[in-house]
Amino acid sequence: MSRIGRLPIDVPAGVDVKIDGQAVTVKGPKGELSLTVASPIEVKLEEGQVLVTRPDDERESRSLHGLTRTLLNNNIVGVTQGYSKGLEIVGTGYRVAQKGAGVEFALGFSHPVTVEPPAGITFTVEGNNKLTVAGIDKQAVGEVAANIRKIRKPEPYKGKGVRYAGEVVRRKAGKAGK
């Protein structure tokens, strides 16, 4: 058995889990998320716990077992606590500003870069060089944060660019002068 897959998922108070065939819907105080479970995996709700089981020890079943359990757990944590990812903007003249629901970046380009949040994602700007991406879907929060970082990745010589909060950027020595 998968060490992760066999662990039961506790369903906290205020969270409603509905299992309809291969579709699992999780409803909580922050919103609603759904997941389509791959065919060999079975999901059961017993005594306030969600159990994920597999019918056999085939390679596909083994690989999907732990994955399905983790995705369901991420959904339950998402609708109760939510997820957030912090970004820092480093560099002279590099800044971020809130523009309605979206944000506008000045990152050394000839034009400002505007990013609008997809459904279920919110942006919070602290100061002019810190941004927090928040939402209930862990995958969507990480993807939006990665797309923002991709606009201007931290460069290795001065470290300028958009980086995750707490990210350590490997620095290189500049060229040796005479």
From Swiss-Prot:
GO terms (BP aspect): cytoplasmic translation
Assigned GO CC terms: cytosolic large ribosomal subunit
Keywords of the record: Ribonucleoprotein, Ribosomal protein, RNA-binding, rRNA-binding
Disulfide bonds: none
Keyword RNA-binding found: yes
Molecular function GO labels: rRNA binding; structural constituent of ribosome
PROSITE patterns, alphabetized: RIBOSOMAL_L6_1
Taxonomy, superkingdom: Bacteria
Claim: rRNA-binding is one of the keywords in the record: yes
NCBIfam families, sorted: L6_bact
Similarity-based family: Belongs to the universal ribosomal protein uL6 family.
Protein's job: This protein binds to the 23S rRNA, and is important in its secondary structure. It is located near the subunit interface in the base of the L7/L12 stalk, and near the tRNA binding site of the peptidyltransferase center.
Subunit structure, interactors included: Part of the 50S ribosomal subunit.
Protein name: Large ribosomal subunit protein uL6
Upper taxonomic lineage: Bacteria, Bacillati, Actinomycetota, Actinomycetes, Micrococcales
Gene name in the database record: rplF
